Regions:
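Conserved N-terminal entry element of GNAT/NAT acetyltransferase domains
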Residues: 1-11, 144
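Conserved GNAT acetyl-CoA-binding A-motif
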Residues: 96-109
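Conserved acetyl-CoA-binding loop-helix of GNAT-fold acetyltransferases
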Residues: 75, 81-94
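Conserved active-site tyrosine of GNAT-family acetyltransferases
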Residues: 20, 116, 121
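C-terminal "cap" of GNAT-fold acetyltransferases
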Residues: 109-110, 129-144
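A conserved beta-turn-beta hairpin within the catalytic core of GNAT-like acetyltransferases
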Residues: 62-71, 80, 129-134
Length: 144
């Protein structure tokens, strides 16, 4: 099975967390204590699979501003460059549109800002530190 699915079971959520830990905690050195947060239950989580194995994840939730906040986009290093990040973003943006959101916002690692810019996201504000990694806030309309 290949594709992106909405996480609907506890087992699939654990798989999504395993991808996040592999990318953010093990690979990038983000403290495990900040990887899981208070927004897990309210967020819609997505899981990318290749031959049934979890290779990527993302989530979206409604931000305080009312925009769709896309977060925790991660693809295992063994599957980067295969389009899974774009597929995860497509799924999150589509679900956000279905929920009535007309704008998406995200806090991108500066090293990934080009990926999001190619999808129509524009920088809003300056660089800031999150978990020891430089980030920038980016946003785009979802009606395009």
């Amino acid at each position: 099975m290949h594709g992106v699915e909405v996480v609907e079971t506890a087992a699939a959520f654990r798989e999504a967390l395993a991808v996040r830990y592999a990318v953010f905690v093990d690979e990038q050195g983000v403290p495990a204590s900040v990887e899981v947060d208070d927004h897990e239950a309210e967020a819609t989580h997505f899981l990318a699979r290749v031959d049934g194995a979890a290779v990527g994840t993302a989530r979206y939730r409604t931000a305080e501003s009312g925009a769709a906040k896309i977060e925790r986009v991660a693809v295992r290093d063994t599957h980067r460059g295969e389009g899974w990040g774009a597929r995860l973003m497509d799924a999150a943006e589509a679900r956000a549109r279905e929920a009535g959101h007309d704008r998406a916002v995200l806090d991108a690692q500066t090293s990934a800002a080009g990926f999001y810019a190619a999808r129509g996201y524009e920088r809003v504000g300056g660089v800031f530190d999150e978990a020891g990694i430089p980030h920038v806030t980016m946003e785009r309309p979802l009606d395009e």
